[in-house]
Amino acid sequence: MSSRVTLHPGREKSLLRRHPWIFASAIESTKGRMNLGDTVDVYSHEDVWLGRGAYSPHSQIQVRIWTFTQNESVDNGFFQRRIARAQQSREELIERHGLTGYRLIAAESDGLPGVTIDVYANVIVCQLLSAGADKHREKIVWALKAQFPEHGIYERSDVAVRKKEGLEEITQVLAGDIPDEVIIEENGVKIIVNVKQGHKTGFYLDQRDNRAIAAQYAKDRDVLNCFCYTGTFGSYALAAGACSVTSLDVSDLALETAKRNVDINQLDSSKCEFINHDVFQALRDYKAQSKQFSQIILDPPKFVDSKASLNRACRGYKDINMLAMQIMAPGGILATFSCSGLMPFDLFQKVVADAALDAGREVQIIQRLSQAPDHPVSTNYPEGFYLKGLICKVL
């Protein structure tokens, strides 16, 4: 007999809408031997089968659903089908844009809760962030090898959220030879990706379309790229004809890579300045110096990691947008982003509006932006929508 979870009366509604999470408070009882990451069957209080998922007793989300099909086993074939489907759904995008770097698996949105997989040329980088994903590591690697027999596979599960699942952080080679760096190309721009030490899996693929959109406004402008990481917004801007690009970050490694990205794209490095400085303080310093820019990119790290921190995050977003608006030349373009899934788009837009009031500037929103299409959002899992951005004209 399989292990099973029975829900409290009425708590099956989200599963009937095929949402993949079951919180601890929804569980009435469990039956059978259930270890971390084990596959369990989920039943309603009325004993109706609802789904099959991974058990995680240490997490608030105690079951993450693998499948809503009762006769589908969670075996090698299951992961092979999911990965093949995800690759097929991205083929048109890959071919249309000539991508060599893309997100292959976007966790719950691709039917694999807790699994993030990015492809960088001939290297695959995966993050296994849930108990179920960790439990099925060998099956996932087997499926990846079947789909990509020539690729190296590297695990970057060095993420604090694993501790909530009762798991340790880990990085390791899973297959093949893994170089420290890989070069990918998107929209004609080459990008150095450090798969072993870079942020996340090495790079922010979700901003691909937004980099191209921001670059459309860069010609003949002086661009300030805040939280620049490896400088790709800046490389795009230079390629589009920017007069100058000033890149700010607090990582020497990121700034050095940003310089190298300029060089490998054969762009004019004399137009570039790379500064290791806290962005908030740098913006205040520019204001004190009466220095202005005609395009500013604000792509900060996640400010919101819990609902309790949302108000504090709003203050941070407002302050940084206000400071940017205060040093913007008339008619300048602000590209501002939030990668915090807990920040609603309407609230983010309100925060930017409040920043404009405090800055004493008239501001127009001319585009609303989101994550690239290889980061899809399942209609059953709206939490998959996290990246939001605004292109604003500061009058």
Swiss-Prot record:
Keyword flag NAD: no
Membership in a protein family: Belongs to the methyltransferase superfamily. RlmI family.
UniProt keyword list: Cytoplasm, Methyltransferase, RNA-binding, rRNA processing, S-adenosyl-L-methionine, Transferase
Molecular function (Gene Ontology), one example: rRNA (cytosine) methyltransferase activity
Gene designation per UniProt: rlmI
Domain PUA: start-end pairs: 2-79
Location relative to the cell: Cytoplasm
PANTHER family reported for this sequence: RIBOSOMAL RNA LARGE SUBUNIT METHYLTRANSFERASE (PTHR42873), S-ADENOSYLMETHIONINE-DEPENDENT METHYLTRANSFERASE DOMAIN-CONTAINING PROTEIN (PTHR42873:SF1)
Protein name per Swiss-Prot or TrEMBL: Ribosomal RNA large subunit methyltransferase I
EC numbers: 2.1.1.191
Regions crossing the membrane: none
Gene3D superfamilies: PUA domain (2.30.130.10), RNA methyltransferase domain (HRMD) like (3.30.750.80), Vaccinia Virus protein VP39 (3.40.50.150)
Catalyzed reactions: cytidine(1962) in 23S rRNA + S-adenosyl-L-methionine = 5-methylcytidine(1962) in 23S rRNA + S-adenosyl-L-homocysteine + H(+)
First-tier enzyme category under EC: transferase
Keyword RNA-binding tagged: yes
Matching CDD domains: AdoMet_MTases, PUA_RlmI, RlmI_M_like
GO cellular component, one term: cytoplasm
Domain of life: Bacteria
Function as written in the Swiss-Prot or TrEMBL entry: Specifically methylates the cytosine at position 1962 (m5C1962) of 23S rRNA.
